[in-house]
């Protein structure tokens, strides 16, 4: 049925191959074959095992015939080891061969103990009809035999070696051609390399590792999995420690930042359409901000954070009413089934406000009004076990879920306390800001009391609340929208009540006013009808664009032989604000940056800062003067502002990028 290849291992002789014949060269004449009955189990081994000799021989008792000249079992499949008939033939032939060799050993008085000590491992490989005609069988056998001495050298010295049973090794190789030599021996010619398949045995496969060579195919090896450290955050860090109980390390992390009053892992529902729950590391600080991170590592590195401002938010628990003692001015949701979204979208509705000083013991519990759909909502409340929601004033909702009821209630109580503390601090800071802004309010009131500022500069609407900074005028809200469409080059719009007003801006507004501005911008109106409060927006826009964009009503320049730039220099030196505004309205950027003709190289900005006039300095900057310009001595306007001790001019110049020589 097939031939038998016997592999023997000698512990004292190195592995040798015959390069010319292409087969393993034996160093001794003995051939030792052992079956399952003859193995010497428990035989002691030497402490140091040397590389072994491996001999591969083809038995002569069973000669190899060509597959076409031999009788094959009808039910024989590709793998003979899986066929009962092939296994029976193999067992009969191999057992007969072993019995004959054993009888020969007894006749010649050959001791098996000698072989058990001399040879460390013996195994018989059966070559059936399917494996005998496949490629590169020689190299496959060599690769297997190379594994044996390497395995012996790597074994524990205290481990005893037992000769394994005869095993059926099936090789999944391509094709091999066997030729007959003149001396009766068999030689194998290989044509393609292959990888041996796993032997069909019940014993556990040993882990072999053969050094790769050019002529040896890669064997199938079992190697232990190694964890890669390519993506570890820090050198020497253990990624397993970061995954274990991050709550236990909460008190030892976050140095250099505000220590959270509460922190831990919570589940957060994503806002996408999938609505998946992901773990987040959530921190609550005393500044009224709830921050969540993707992991504890991100919190330690202070990256990938998202914050929720609790001052403008409220917390809701499904199936529970909020505690009135811990919430201040919290809107109460209606009993409609729509829930949070409708309440936040409207932004209106009933709300109950309580003083922060009222304690929970003085206020009775509020029972929710009976709802006709209460029975329908019971199953919905059961689904939301440990989750809570944070809803902002804009309607944005964050869903969180804790592991237990107690943990959820602790988070809810802590967040409610921070909401109340944020509202209280907001009230105290607002009162402080009111005290500090009294001077600003008085200054703004003085601007409104100026001549002509009681009406809109363009349509005469009463009590205007909007201003144009570079024009120095007040206007109504409708005209302010038209001024915004002109662009900041022509009009810089700002609200009297909503925006901040620094000192230099208040001085500009209090120095010009509507009457002075209209005397310049409407100096040549030629009797045209000015729009009124009842005029349409189109009429107001037509008037405003003709007045400021086309400059149709602008007063004419004074008759003089000086250029506009020189006139501007003189008006700045004389601090003539009305003439300077007229010249700026008529002039271009080049004319505004004209220097004095006396050789000192000063611009109008240098002269304004030398005088310490912040109004002229600010107007010149808005109309395009170069703040980086230097005079003949290399001085900037900031140098003259420092000489004049004008802090307002210094602030304006630094704000617009004037180089500071003192830094």
Curated annotation (Swiss-Prot):
Belongs to the centaurin gamma-like family. The keyword Thylakoid does not apply. SMART domains: ANK, ArfGap, PH. Residues 235-250 have a biased composition (Basic and acidic residues). Encoded by one of the numerous copies of centaurin gamma-like genes clustered in the q11 region of chromosome 10. One of its GO terms (molecular function) is GTPase activity. ANK repeats lie at residues 600-629, 633-662. Residues 188-202 have a biased composition (Low complexity). Residues 203-216 have a biased composition (Polar residues). Keywords: ANK repeat, GTPase activation, Metal-binding, Repeat, Zinc, Zinc-finger. Residues 182-216, 231-255 are annotated as: Disordered. Residues 259-420 form the PH domain. This is Putative Arf-GAP with GTPase, ANK repeat and PH domain-containing protein 7. A zinc finger (C4-type) spans 456-479. Putative GTPase-activating protein. Coiled coil: none annotated. It comes from Homo sapiens (Human). Residues 441-561 form the Arf-GAP domain.
């Amino acid at each position: 049925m097939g031939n038998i290849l016997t592999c023997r291992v000698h512990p004292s002789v190195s592995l040798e191959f015959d390069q010319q014949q292409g087969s393993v060269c034996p160093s001794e004449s003995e051939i030792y074959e052992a079956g399952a009955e003859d193995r010497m189990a428990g035989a002691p081994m030497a402490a140091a095992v040397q590389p072994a000799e491996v001999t591969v021989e083809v038995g002569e008792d069973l000669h190899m015939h060509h597959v076409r000249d031999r009788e094959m079992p009808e039910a024989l499949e590709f793998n003979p080891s899986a066929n009962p008939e092939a296994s029976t033939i193999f067992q009969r032939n191999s057992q007969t061969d072993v019995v004959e060799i054993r009888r020969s050993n007894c006749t010649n008085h050959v001791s098996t103990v000698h072989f058990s000590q001399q040879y460390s491992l013996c195994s018989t490989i059966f070559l059936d009809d399917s494996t005998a005609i496949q490629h590169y069988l020689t190299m496959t056998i060599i690769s297997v035999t190379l594994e044996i001495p390497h395995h012996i050298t790597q074994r524990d010295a205290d481990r005893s070696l037992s000769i394994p049973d005869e095993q059926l090794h099936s090789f999944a190789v391509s094709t091999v051609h066997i030729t007959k030599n003149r001396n009766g021996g068999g030689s194998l010619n290989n044509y393609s390399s292959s990888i041996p398949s796993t032997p069909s045995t019940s014993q556990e496969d040993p882990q072999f590792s053969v050094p790769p060579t050019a002529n040896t195919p890669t064997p199938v090896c079992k190697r232990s999995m190694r964890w890669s450290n390519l993506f570890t955050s820090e050198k020497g860090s253990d990624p397993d420690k970061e995954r274990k109980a991050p709550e236990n390390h909460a008190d030892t992390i976050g140095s250099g930042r505000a220590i959270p009053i509460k922190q831990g892992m919570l589940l957060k529902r994503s806002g996408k359409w999938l609505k998946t729950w992901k773990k987040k590391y959530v921190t609550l600080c005393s500044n009224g901000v709830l921050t969540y991170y993707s992991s504890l590592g991100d919190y330690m590195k202070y990256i990938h954070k998202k914050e929720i401002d609790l001052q403008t938010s409220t917390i809701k628990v499904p199936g529970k009413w909020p505690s009135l003692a811990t919430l201040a001015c919290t809107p109460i949701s209606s009993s409609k089934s729509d829930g949070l979204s409708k309440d936040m979208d409207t932004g209106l509705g009933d709300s109950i406000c309580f003083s922060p000083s009222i304690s929970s013991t003085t206020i009775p519990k509020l029972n929710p009004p009976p709802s006709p759909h209460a029975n329908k909502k019971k199953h919905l409340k059961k689904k939301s076990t440990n989750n809570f929601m944070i809803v902002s004033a804009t309607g944005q909702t964050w869903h969180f879920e804790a592991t237990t009821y107690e943990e959820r209630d602790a988070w809810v109580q802590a967040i409610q306390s921070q909401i109340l503390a944020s509202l209280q601090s907001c009230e105290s800071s607002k009162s402080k800001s009111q005290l500090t802004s009294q001077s600003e309010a008085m200054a703004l009131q003085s601007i409104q009391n100026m001549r002509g500022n009681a009406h809109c500069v363009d349509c005469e609407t009463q009590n205007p609340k909007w201003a144009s900074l570079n024009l120095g005028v007040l206007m109504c809200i409708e005209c302010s929208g038209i001024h915004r469409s002109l662009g900041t080059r022509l009009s810089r719009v700002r609200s009297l009540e909503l925006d901040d007003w620094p000192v230099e801006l208040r001085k500009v507004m209090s120095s010009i006013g509507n009457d002075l501005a209209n005397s310049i911008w409407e100096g040549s109106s030629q009797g045209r009808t000015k729009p009124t409060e009842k005029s349409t927006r189109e009429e107001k826009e037509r008037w405003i664009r003709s007045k400021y964009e086309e400059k149709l009503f602008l007063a004419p320049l004074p008759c003089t032989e000086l250029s506009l730039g020189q006139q501007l220099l003189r008006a700045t030196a004389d601090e003539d604000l009305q003439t300077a505004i007229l010249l700026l309205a008529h002039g271009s950027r080049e004319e505004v940056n004209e220097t004095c003709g006396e050789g000192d190289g000063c611009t109008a900005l240098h002269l304004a800062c030398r005088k310490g006039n912040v109004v002229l300095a600010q107007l010149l900057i808005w109309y395009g003067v170069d703040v980086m310009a230097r005079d003949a001595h290399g001085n900037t306007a900031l140098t003259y502002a420092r000489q004049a001790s004008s802090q307002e001019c210094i602030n304006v110049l630094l704000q617009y990028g004037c180089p500071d020589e003192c830094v």
